[in-house]
Each structure stands twice: as C-alpha cells, then as structure tokens.
Design a protein with these regions (language model features):
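C-terminal luminal/periplasmic domains and tails of membrane-associated envelope-modifying transferases
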Residues: 21, 425-434, 441-535
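Membrane-lumen/periplasm interface segments of multi-pass, membrane-embedded glycan/lipid transferases
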Residues: 61-96, 233-310, 336-344, 348-351, ...
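Juxtamembrane segments of multi-pass membrane glycosylation machinery
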Residues: 89-111, 116, 121, 279-284
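Transmembrane-helix motifs of polytopic, lipid-linked glycan transferases
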Residues: 107-128, 168-172, 301-302
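Transmembrane-helix signature of polytopic, membrane-embedded enzymes
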Residues: 120, 124-146, 163-164
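Short hydrophobic alpha-helices at membrane interfaces in multi-pass membrane enzymes
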Residues: 172-196
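Perimembrane helix-loop-helix junctions
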Residues: 207-237
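Signature aromatic-anchored transmembrane alpha helix within multi-pass, membrane-resident enzymes
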Residues: 368-401
C-alpha cells in the first residue's frame, strides 16, 4: 500500500494473511504510540492539577450524602444534574473512588481523552483507512488543544465519556451491519444502548448519532442500514425527550437562532484557522487567523481547480475526507446554536464545546496536509511522503506547545486556589449554615481557566473547608456585587440572586486576611464604605 491509500475506497473483502499480519503489527504500533504520547503529554499534569468549577460542587454534594452510601451520593448529585444521569453517575463514581485527591480524577480524564483517540482510530480502520493515515488523525485529536479542558478538568471529562460511548456504539453497529440473525440484532441493540448512554452523558453526540446512517450505508447499503438507523432515531427521541424535560440549560428563543448560527459559525471558522496555523488566539481577528484562513482557501481552491480540469484524480479522496471532516465538525456544533452563550472560540473551560467537532477538524486538517503535500510534491518534483510528514510534525509541535501552555495556566489556577483556601482557613468560620462573601478572590488564572469564579465552586470549596453542608459562599468577582439590603446582604450577578442573613454572614478580604462578622445593615455598610476591595 502506498502513502496515498485512503478511506475513500471501500474495503475490498478480507486481506491476505500476510497483509493482515502486517496491518495488525502496524495497528499495535500506532496504539502503543498513542499511549506513549498520552503519558508524556498528560502524565505530569495529573500529578499537580486540581479541582475546578463544578468539581468543587460535585465533591461537596457527594461527600455530604455518601455517608449513607454510594447510592445516596448518586441521588444527591442527580438533584443538581438530572438531565445527564450517566455523566452524573460517572462524577459520583469518581468521587467514591478518588475522594478529594484530584490526581485520580485527572488520570481518568486523560484516559478518556486517550480512549477517544483510540476509538476514532478503530472507526477509521473499520471504514477502510490505512494505519498510516488514521494514526496521524488520532494523534491530532489526542493533542488538540482547543478542546483540552475535557482532559484537564475532571467534570469536563464527561464530554469525552460521551464520545467514547458514541464511538464504541458506532463500532458495534458497523460490525453488526454485515451480519444477520439474533446476533446482529443483539449487537445493534447494544450499540443503541451505548448511544443512549452517550446522550445521557453529554448532548454533543445527538446529531452524530442521527447522521450515523451515512456510515451504515457505506458499510452495508440497503434496507438493514435504514432499519437499524430507525431504531437509533426512536431511542434518541426518547432520551432527548427525557433530557429536555429535565434540563436547566438556558435556551435561545427561535428569533435569536439566525444570529446564534452566525456567531457559532464565526467561532468555528476561527478554530479551524487556528488548527491549520496554530499560532495566536481564536478570540479575535488577527494576522495569524487571516493566514490560517488563506491557507485553507489556497490549498482547497487549488485542489478543486485541478480536479475540475481533470488533472487531479489523486486529490479526490482527500477532498472527500475534507468534506467528511467538515460534516463531522458541523455535527458537533449544531447543538450549540440553541444554547445561549457558547462559542467555539472561547478558551478555558468553555472550549469543551469543541470536543466532538475536534474529530472532524482533525480529519479536515489532515486532508489539507495531504492536499498540500500532493500539490507541492508535484510542483517541486519531490516525494510526497516527506512533505506530508513534515507538515504533520509542524502541526503536532504547534498543538503540543499550546497544550503545555494551557496546562501551565491550569496549574496556576490550582496554586491560586490553594492560596485562597489557606487564607480562608486562617480566618474564623462563618456561623453554621450561614453565608460568606469573599473579596479579592481571583476569578481566573488565564482566560476561561477558573480559580473561584462562581458561587458553586466557592460554596463547594468552603463547605469542604469548614465541614458545613449548608454554607453559602460567593466570590465578589466576575461581575458579582454585594449590597446592604434591609433584610440581609444582597448578592447579585449573572448567575446569582441571593440574600445572606445578617448575623450569620462573614465578609473576608482574602488578600489581607481581614474578616468581619456582618451582624447588621450598618456593619455591612461600614465594611463597604471604609474599604471595598475589588477583584
């Protein structure tokens, strides 16, 4: 097989024994290579990362209920995340196994990221792609830094769990398609269960499940593909109905969907531009983003022009792969249009929205590499393989550098959290079941990388610190403010509207260690008027 063998050609029956043995050895080498890269890329981080955002909330809520057993702990978490029951069970299981030590949680998160890469590799191989090409695509997915929060943040790893379940279901469905009889039905029933579990972990996989019929048809064209896809659709409709009835996610009104579609598309284009030219940021238009966009336009445009002139038959498979990657990426982004506030270009914990699209983006980028290598090789009269390897290596280095930079930011956030909690531990505890307003607490260590940025992470950490499962704590940052109302301390913010009772609330300036019990409206005003720390 040459370098140019791709997934565009349908698998032609069972390979010869020698070829099969060679493929097995190559598959084993690719798997070993991906495992090694995962250990090098994520192993050190698992030892010094921390809890972030929802991690604190889940840890505190599970701990208080789990004294009555694991099931009680699961039930308590379901009260705050009932629309994603499999993801919630996963969070409870991690809490039961690893407790308050982030290391075990982060090892599982990294393992799920590796699992996505390995399962994608397996799917591409089943669909006929040679290891030489499926391997680099899986490697790009493993390192893809614009969705790295799902590998660096324990709660975010539920998104990778969802993708693992989806890809496992897809593999099972593809293996079942050529078969007939009870075994085939049982295998597809298993795939439907995996799809359902995936959707009950995270919603990103809904559209991919509905589009899986395209792969079914490619694997085994005909009525069996349609019948089995029909079973998928019915199951997804039932699960989606349950999730929609229980969700607390803010949805955009229909009138806002066109504007949201433009916003999501612009963010996605910025992510794709960065993926091709991994320099700079994705948050705004910059020279780097323009260069990335021009690379896409020039390479695709030149390839399409050659094909149109009938001189680029070798380019067609890669154009098809680029189109398939675009479809996969779009399938990952469609669900964002109706969800308020999510943008693919955002950083930190918000980049989890790119997690499924990353599979398609990696396919698209690798197709672009091959299109560029083929055209450059012909123009320069040089072998294609070294050019393709060099271009892929440049991308891998760019991804790895950004990943290491992001990991440094997440480590900084963990260090800042430790400092904040040490400072809080040195102040008197709020009255039992009372409230805490913490001033001069850093919200983020880097864009989107939280220290304590919401009530749920501050509350979870404070409850664990003082062993008080009724305490409410608010960091006065990230647009949040306090006011001295008649009945108590009013806390307002984008996610908050609460009132903390006088006499059972403390104000703490984390930077100075100043701490005061707020017993009255006058005491509240005195604190704010004398010195209102800002963060």
């Amino acid at each position: 097989m040459s370098l140019l063998d791709t997934a565009a050609a349908r698998p032609r029956g069972r390979p010869a024994p020698a070829a099969a043995r060679r493929d097995r050895r190559t598959d084993a080498a690719v798997v070993a290579g991906l495992i090694l890269v995962a250990l090098l890329a994520f192993g050190p981080y698992t030892l010094d990362g921390g809890f972030y955002s929802d991690d604190w909330n889940f840890a505190a809520d599970y701990q208080v209920a789990s004294v009555d057993g694991f099931i009680a702990g699961v039930g308590n978490l379901l009260e705050i995340s009932v629309s994603r029951p499999v993801g919630t069970f996963y969070a409870a299981l991690r809490a039961e196994l690893f407790g308050l030590d982030p290391t075990g949680h982060l090892i599982v998160s990294a393992a799920l990221g590796l699992g996505v890469a390995l399962l994608l590799y397996a799917v591409l191989r089943v669909l006929g792609m040679r290891p030489l090409h499926a391997g680099p695509i899986a490697l790009l997915v493993l390192l893809f830094p614009l969705a790295d929060s799902v590998r660096l943040w324990s709660s975010g790893s539920a998104a990778n769990l969802a993708i693992c379940l989806y890809l496992a279901g897809l593999l099972l469905a593809l293996e079942a398609l050529p078969r007939r009889g009870p075994l085939a039905l049982a295998m597809h029933a298993g795939s439907v269960l995996l799809y359902a579990a995936s959707l009950m972990s995270y919603e990103f996989t809904l559209v991919p499940v509905l589009l899986s019929v395209l792969l079914y048809w490619r694997r085994a064209p005909g009525r069996p593909a349609l019948w089995r896809w029909g079973a998928d659709v019915l199951a997804m409709a039932a699960v989606l109905g349950l999730a929609t009835a229980q969700t607390t996610l803010e949805r955009e009104p229909l009138s806002a969907l066109p504007e949201r579609a433009v916003e999501v598309s612009a963010g996605a284009l910025s992510v794709i531009s960065w993926s091709v030219f991994p320099l700079g940021d994705t948050a705004d238009v910059s020279p780097a983003r323009v260069i990335g966009g021009l690379i896409v336009i020039v390479v695709l445009g030149a390839a399409l022009l050659r094909v149109r002139r009938g001189r680029g038959a070798e380019l067609r498979p890669w154009l098809l792969l680029a189109a398939a990657g675009t479809l996969v990426a779009a399938a990952g982004y469609v669900v964002l249009i109706a969800a308020a506030g999510y943008n693919p270009a955002h950083r930190g914990i918000a980049n989890r929205v790119n997690v499924f699209a990353a599979l398609g983006i990696a396919m698209f980028v690798y197709a672009l590499v091959m299109l560029a290598a083929l055209q450059l090789g012909e123009r320069l009269r040089r072998p294609v393989a070294p050019i393709a390897i060099a271009l892929t290596a440049l991308l891998v280095v760019g991804y790895a550098v950004r990943l290491q930079s992001d990991q440094s930011s997440w480590r900084d956030a963990a260090d800042e959290q430790e400092r904040v909690l040490d400072d809080l531990a040195g102040t008197p505890a709020p009255p039992a079941g009372g409230g805490l307003a913490a001033f001069r607490v850093p919200a983020f260590a880097a864009p989107g990388v939280p220290v304590f940025h919401q009530s749920w992470d501050m509350t979870g950490a404070a409850r664990l610190l003082w062993d008080d499962d009724a305490l409410q704590a608010y960091p006065v940052n990230n647009g949040r403010s306090v006011a001295c109302a008649a009945g108590g301390v009013a806390v307002t913010g984008e996610e908050d509207d609460a009132e903390l009772p006088y006499g059972r609330t403390r104000f703490v300036d984390v930077a100075s260690g100043r701490s005061t019990r707020i017993g009255s409206r006058a005491a509240c005003r005195a604190w704010l008027e004398t010195r209102e720390p800002r963060s």
